[in-house]
UniProtKB/Swiss-Prot annotation:
InterPro entries: ACP (IPR003231), ACP-like_sf (IPR036736), PP-bd_ACP (IPR009081), Ppantetheine_attach_site (IPR006162). Its main location: cytoplasm. Keywords: Cytoplasm, Fatty acid biosynthesis, Fatty acid metabolism, Lipid biosynthesis, Lipid metabolism, Phosphopantetheine, Phosphoprotein. The modification O-(pantetheine 4'-phosphoryl)serine is found at S40. Residues 5-80 form the Carrier domain. GO terms for biological process: lipid A biosynthetic process. 4'-phosphopantetheine is transferred from CoA to a specific serine of apo-ACP by AcpS. This modification is essential for activity because fatty acids are bound in thioester linkage to the sulfhydryl of the prosthetic group. Pathway: Lipid metabolism; fatty acid biosynthesis. NCBIfam families: acyl_carrier (TIGR00517), PRK00982.1-2 (NF002148), PRK00982.1-4 (NF002150), PRK00982.1-5 (NF002151). This is Acyl carrier protein. Pfam families: PP-binding.
Amino acid sequence: MASREEIFSKVKSIISEKLGVDESQVTEEAKLIDDLGADSLDLVDLVMDFESEFGVKVDDADLEKISTVGDIVSYIEKKLG
């Protein structure tokens, strides 16, 4: 099982690459839309990448509750058990 730090590292890398932001901006507290400039299409792309990378399914209802990088890490961590 991946540790929280390993999950965060992979999530950070994916977000940095997809959104074209420096990895130093991608903190657990960073808001995907407000701080990192993601839009709804970016979120869909990111979710597909997370699902592929971690082998988890992100439910649409759960996606609405995710606003920060830390939310994503916690969600994936929970899904991986």
